[in-house]
């Protein structure tokens, strides 16, 4: 494998897509030794076929805000690879979303899904729409407008989206509701749905729990016990909540969590009722951390 040659070719085809190019290079460097032991891979141009997405959909999403003004965002779906199953990957709503980021995420999702040994391909989608500061009605209207285009390209045997940053059970519910209306079908087209219409009970905490199980096994492999360790968690959503909860159960002490507005530090530990209370405030859009807080006082 000639990594420099591959990257030169990709840079010419995808100029300016730094996130995607960096992700590809990191993967190539990590598999180079093993790949070079299999000349049949080179003969089949396996890498060249893996690094390019199967197809990309880009579309405009016009929607009406609470003031009656029409807003227009961009929507994307990158169907990266379905060699072993339907495309599978989340939908992200965040102002930073662009095609390079989604290609990078879809590329890595292909490998993550393959490692589960389940028949799932890789994909990713989203929009530069940010739910932050938007009303429930605005978020609903945007999700419905987004699905007016995306519904043609997803389905239980084609492409199965899920949530990601900015997309939780509420947003998935809005999108799935519009999908059902357009297709007149109730199928397994989305994961991350609410319990009331076929979702999984452990979905909210699954990612955070899984991350801590992985960390715990890595520490054990090094002969280190997680009990008594001090932990800092970057994030303030479902993944962070699951990670904090499981870290505490395993005997570690989480002293800080962070969000887009700042962070909370509590040397006595952030867990249990404290984090549940903060997540409740966040869900109600009442919490705003404007300055770093050294000792959080939560009663």
Segments from the language model and where they lie:
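Glycine-rich Rossmann-fold phosphate-binding loop(s) that bind the pyrophosphate
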Residues: 236
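NAD(P)-binding Rossmann-fold cofactor-contacting core
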Residues: 252-286
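Structured beta-strand/loop patches that form or line metal/cofactor-binding pockets in enzymes
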Residues: 40-69
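Single conserved hydrophobic/aromatic residue that forms the stacking wall/gate
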Residues: 287-299
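Hydrophobic Val/Ile/Leu positions in short beta-strands of Rossmann-like dinucleotide-binding domains
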Residues: 231-233
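N-terminal Rossmann-fold NAD(P) dinucleotide-binding loop
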Residues: 240-241
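Glycine/serine-rich phosphate-binding loop and adjoining beta1-alpha1 elements at the start
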Residues: 94, 113-227
């Amino acid at each position: 494998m000639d990594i420099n040659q591959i990257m030169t070719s990709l840079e010419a085809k995808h100029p300016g897509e730094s996130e995607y190019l960096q992700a590809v290079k990191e993967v190539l460097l990590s598999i180079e030794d093993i790949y070079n032991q299999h000349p049949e891979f080179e003969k089949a141009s396996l890498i060249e076929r893996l690094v390019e997405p199967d197809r990309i959909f880009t579309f405009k999403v016009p929607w009406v805000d609470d003031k009656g003004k029409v807003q227009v965002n961009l929507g994307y779906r990158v169907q990266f690879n379905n060699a072993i199953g339907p495309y599978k990957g989340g939908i992200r709503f965040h102002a930073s979303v662009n095609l390079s980021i989604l290609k990078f995420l879809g590329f890595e999702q292909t490998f993550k899904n393959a490692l589960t040994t389940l028949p799932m391909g890789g994909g990713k989608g989203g929009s530069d729409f940010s739910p932050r500061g938007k009303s429930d009605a605005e978020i609903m209207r945007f999700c419905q407008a987004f699905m007016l285009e995306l519904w043609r390209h997803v389905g239980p045997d084609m492409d199965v989206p899920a949530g990601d940053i900015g997309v939780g059970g509420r947003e998935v519910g809005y999108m799935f509701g519009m999908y059902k209306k357009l297709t007149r079908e109730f199928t397994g087209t989305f994961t991350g749905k609410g319990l009331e219409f076929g979702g999984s009970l452990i979905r909210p905490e699954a990612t955070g729990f899984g991350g801590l199980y992985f960390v715990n096994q890595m520490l054990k492999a090094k002969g280190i016990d997680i009990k008594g360790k001090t932990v800092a968690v970057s994030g303030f959503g479902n993944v962070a909540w699951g990670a904090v909860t499981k870290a505490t159960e395993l005997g570690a002490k989480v002293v800080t969590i962070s969000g887009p507005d700042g962070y909370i530090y509590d040397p006595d530990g952030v867990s249990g009722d404290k984090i549940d209370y903060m997540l409740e405030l966040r869900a109600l859009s009442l919490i705003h951390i404007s300055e770093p807080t050294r000792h959080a006082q939560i009663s």
